[in-house]
Every structure is written in C-alpha cells, then in structure tokens.
Amino acid sequence: MCIKHTLLLSVLVSLVACNQNHHNASSSQWLLIDNFESNLNDWQKADTDNQTKPHQPNPQITIIEKEQSSDHANHYLLKKPAAEGVIGNRKALTYKKLPKPVPVGETYTFYTRINVAAFPNNHAFGLSNLQPDEINKHGYDAFEPTLRVTDKAESNGHINDGALMVKTDTGYSNIQNYKTAQSAQPLNTNTWYNVWYVVNNASVKMQGQQYNVYVQGGEFKTQTLVYKNAKFRMKRELPLIYFLANCNTGPLKKPYGNGGLKYDDLYMSRGINLSSPL
C-alpha cells in the first residue's frame, strides 16, 4: 500500500513539474530585440526625405529616456520626427536587425509595449525584409507587417482618430473591438499598451503574408484579439530581418504634428506565443 502511494505521489509530482515546465516554456522562448536598458548602438537612423527649412541635418529625435516607477527605473525609446516647431522631415527611419530572421513559411509572434507621448502625430512600426540601403530607398514601402498610430487627415479628407491601425490591401484600418462590433477607441496618451502581432510569413498562395493583432490596455482590460488577417504591405515573400519604425512631420504647408511615440520591450518568439515575455 505504501509503495502504491509512493508511486502515485511520484507520478503526480512529475505531472505537476511537467505542467510547470510547459507553462514556463512559453516565456523562455521569447528572444529580446531590445528593452532600451543600455544604448542605441545597434540601431540605424536615416532621415531620407528631409525637407526642413531652414535645413536641419538629422532632425529626428530617437532617444532613450528614463521612466521612474515606485519600484525601479525603467528606460524606453522615445521617437519623434523632429523637435517641436520643426517641420518638413517626411521620413524619419529607425531600424534594428532582428536577433534571428523569420523564414518564409514560418509564423512568429512579436511583442512590444507602446505609449503615445502626445498627439497630433504620425507613426508606423513593424517589420521589414529589406537590407538597410533598401530600407532607406523604399521608406514606407520597406514595411511588411505594419502598425500605425496617427490622428492626421488623409489626402481624401478622412481624419484618423488616433486608434491603433493595421495595414489592409486597400489602405489602413483601425483595430476592432469585436465584442461591441465597433472600431476600437483612440489610444490614450501616457498609457502603456501591450501589443502582440502574430506574423504569418508563408506565401500568399499558402494563405500567408498576413498577421493577427492582440492588445491589452486602454479599453481592453485583458489580452484581446483586435484584428484578424491584416495584410503585409508589399508581400515580397522574403525572410523578415529588421524591426522598423518611421514617423513624419507632414508636409511644410500642412504639417501633422510632432507628437512622440514611446517604445519598450521588443521581443520575438517562434510560432504563436501569447504569453508575456516580461
């Protein structure tokens, strides 16, 4: 009897340990892209459409700042197209090579935290499958999976409201609150949002070149699917190799505004991984 109890206990302990290891495996699979706790030496910056007048070389602001909390000092990246009052920087590119490429045919999950420092603004971030010289050449068309934050007016007169946006085959779309069957609310300023985007880098023929987005923050109190089957911008069907962020003051005659966007805790994980890397 005692032996049976001992064997049963051993089995139960093994099962618990197995479950714990499985639970912890998801967080251990995350690869750090950057958490901005050191420097920006591995990042490249390029202002490839600098129309500032009077001309200002390298007008973009891409800096690490410190955020004081009750228990520790956290650092994050602040990105702006230029200082307040400076207009005409149309492409403020900032990018970093991923710790490993996302091969064609594979799915990876990317995680980041974002925080709108201020509106009005015009920001986009996501992934590229181009090398640096080609990123600089193509600008916005260097993106594949893309997320966008802006409240600018479009050329057709439509005014964006500051909700997080994704790329579609016809332009951009606000993320959705599927529970209310409505567009998501505008992002709150000075509020951190957790964003997961699950990137399917299979070919178009294999129903790839698309991504799903999950958000926690603001109106979404828990992690929530907010967009299904958003589309890669160019669908080049190449390995994804860079994290890319871009922002834009707007044209000299009708500037958008230079409000900043904060980034922190960029991670990637093979497969679908909706755990938190933090």
What are these regions (language model features)?
Residues 15-17:
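C-terminal motif of bacterial Sec signal peptides marking the signal peptidase cleavage site
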Residues 24-54, 277-278:
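Extracellular carbohydrate-recognition regions
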Residues 36, 264-271:
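Extracellular beta-strand elements of beta-rich domains used
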Residues 40-84:
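Extracellular glycan-recognition surfaces and repeat-rich motifs
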Residues 75-167:
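Secretory/extracellular carbohydrate-interaction modules
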Residues 168-194:
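Short, aromatic/His-centered strand-loop micro-motif at the edge of beta-sheets
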Residues 191-204, 213:
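Short tryptophan-centered beta-strand motifs in secreted/extracellular beta-sheet-rich domains
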Residues 224-264:
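Flexible glycan-contacting loops in extracellular carbohydrate-active proteins
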